[in-house]
A protein has these predicted regions:
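ATP-dependent adenylation/nucleotidyltransferase module used to activate substrates
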Residues: 1-174
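Mid-to-C-terminal catalytic subdomains of enzymes
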Residues: 172-241
Length: 241
């Protein structure tokens, strides 16, 4: 990391987007080990669907590591781009009643629970708490994914703004499994100046987290996409059989 950032890239430090998850936590801890806490800057980039745990655990990590942070609310930018409107329009093609107070997520059921072709489905939750799962048309599904991809791309744009103003490099947080299976957004979380854990499987990332002293609450947290208004695991969205 030190050779890449200071030698090859000629930058003074590293910027890391903090999600409260295991990957960004390990990358932050590695950067602190390599560059020093005073040369690592963490970014919180919440929007309307960001969980409270993401900010709380990200703040806990930053305090543990002793790094500086900046909070950037990206919701206004996403509103301007039509992210939420485009997503809701796609949902309403399958659930016309979807509106304020409703929540949703995309899920990929386990093939072990079905005797038919496994396709991504939409789960919605009404304000009453009642849930239903329905099929989306391919057009609506692609529009929903395209709309939510705004989030990763706006976050990366924000990371590069802070990297440029500080003369820092942007640290990527995807692990080997995500890169191998294509679980990242082009020019979003897949973009970075250097990628410290891109050669490590998730199990190795967890082992490294314990060695580096990442808070146990973060290590015990189930991996989540933190993309939709309903809680969603990575297995539900992408890694299901």
């Amino acid at each position: 990391i030190r050779e890449q950032v200071m030698g090859q890239l000629r930058r003074r430090g590293a910027v890391v987007g903090l999600s409260g998850g295991i990957d960004s936590s390990v990358v932050s801890a590695l950067c602190v080990r390599a560059l020093g806490a005073d040369r690592v800057h963490g970014l919180f980039m919440p929007e309307h669907h960001t969980s409270e745990d993401a900010l709380r655990l990200g703040s806990k990590l930053a305090q543990t590591l002793g790094i500086s942070t900046t909070l950037e609310d990206i919701a206004p930018v996403l509103h301007g781009l039509g992210c939420y409107r485009r997503q809701d329009d796609a949902v309403r093609t399958a659930v016309p009643d979807f509106g304020p107070g409703w929540k949703c997520k995309l899920v990929l059921p386990s093939i072990l629970e079905s005797n038919r072709l496994n396709v991504t489905q939409l789960t919605v939750q009404a304000p009453s708490g009642q849930t239903q799962t329905v099929r989306l048309s391919s057009t609506a599904y692609l529009q929903m994914v395209a709309a939510t991809n705004f989030k990763q791309r706006v976050r990366k744009m924000t990371e590069y703004y802070h990297a440029d103003r500080l003369n820092y490099a942007v640290a990527g947080t995807p692990n080997l499994l995500e890169y191998d299976q294509g679980f990242f957004v082009k020019q979003g979380d897949g973009a970075a100046d250097f990628k410290p854990i891109a050669h490590l499987y998730k199990t190795q990332v967890y082992q490294l987290a314990e060695y580096l002293g990442v808070p146990e609450e973060i290590r015990q947290r189930a991996p989540t996409t933190d993309t939709f208004s309903m809680p969603q695991t990575q297995e539900e969205f992408y890694f299901a059989l």
